[in-house]
Amino acid sequence: LSHMGIAADQYMRAPNMLLGVAEVLQDAFNCESGDEPLQPWLALCGGNVGPWDDIGALSINVQETLSPTYALGVMWEPNDWFSWGASYTSEADMNMKGTFEIQYTDDWSGFWQSVNGSVLGAITSAILSLPSGAPKESGNVSMDLVYPQHFQTGISVDVHPKLTLNADIGWTDYKQWDAFVFRFDRNLEFLNAARILSPDNATPNTLRLPLGFKSQWNWAFGMEFHASSRLDLRAGVEIRDSVIPDDQRQVMAPFGGANLYSIGMGYQWDKNTEIDMNLSYLHSVESIPADTSCNLNCDNITNIIYNPYAGLDVKTSLRVVMAGLSFRTKF
């Protein structure tokens, strides 16, 4: 039984060609002067908008209180120097529920309020269900998520009374994460606009974030030096290939291929008590040329759901340091 939650606080922008056109028109109308040359027929100067301007901040928090899974394992030790083991953890189907809030910027709200206050803008907005300029939207949200199943197997060989070598291979079914689909309890203004350009990923009350993850096998190798009858020293590396295809890379999950390096130690405090400590380090660097990932930097007019760096080269760097301490005793 486990608890699962997802939370995010994310500024949003929509570097789309249509917002670029809106910015050019605002410059042509000389909006900084405060004049609206085409009023009352068309008004575009209620707020400064553009492809690189924030349109608001999204806060979302969903969780599943109780999620059952099961695990199976087997160990085979034909002699005192060799052992083989395998384990399997089942997937978990979760219906996560929570709340959301979108706080729009004053410029974004003001722009749409001015558009809707003009004759042509009001007609167009009524036909296409464009945003009205609400400053904030909030409510309840839910999503179905499958926590992927995992299989791992490995061997351990005592090559010397002082030295043990280990090799493992593991598989995780990340192909289950083809997309995250959020269902809102009301129609949202931003989604009403997004559905026109991206009907496959947006409806008035649902948002689909494409992921396209793939299942992956990862190798791991380790060694254990038996320094004394009480102290064991450990080191290892896990070779992690990326589960994210090149055309789906993104900044919300900047996990490229990387190696996870670990060191640790185990100490036998007494015959019933063991203490284990470990320290791990991972560094992932991704260089993503412009127009190669439509979750990040495509320049198509239909890429409006999440495409924050349209037409730009992007480089991501992720460093992770993990420390662990465990205490086990028999009684």
Task: List each language-model region with its residue ranges.
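Outer-membrane beta-barrel porins/channels
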Residues: 1-331
